[in-house]
Amino acid sequence: MSEKIVAGNLDEVISKNAEIRDEMREKAVLIRTNLNRMQISSSNRLAMQILKPYGLIQMPIDNPFWSGAIFVKNGKKIPVINTALPRANQYFTAWHEIYHLIYDKVSFSHIIETETVMEERKAEYFASLMLLGNLLPYYTELSEMDFLSKIFHCMDAFAAPYKAVLIALYESAVCLLYTSPSPRDIS
């Protein structure tokens, strides 16, 4: 798990995301093209399809703070997802674990705190990109609603956790404020 994200460190998280944005966008596009031979349109179904060959274990675990992990047994990496959590959290966890399975070369070989924390930030940002894609246009087209209702609609439409939606919208707003292209414009 990466650092705990709160209002006080949100700008730092967005800054870290800016450092890894291009790399993560490239990885997201590679997944959508190279690992989606069956042209699955649902991001959630694609995640499950990618995890199955790794021996995905889905089981309810009575711990609201434990969403998933990768266990290594006899050299084989096996993803586990906590099904006791809401589906949105499960999908986010699935993409998070896919990042570790396919791209993370640090977390399984040795532990260096700063590298591991950055790999966790990359995994979370990657999961957010895979689930939320182009969130801002959807959000802005939800007219005549209060902020919280719009967030709930985004959570439902993208099957994404509350915190991921808030961070993505904040990041998009920061990008718009500084007139850089939105980090969420991937197809």
Annotate each PLM feature:
Residues 1-180, 184-187:
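Active-site hotspot residues in diverse enzymes, especially metal/ion-binding acidic/histidine motifs
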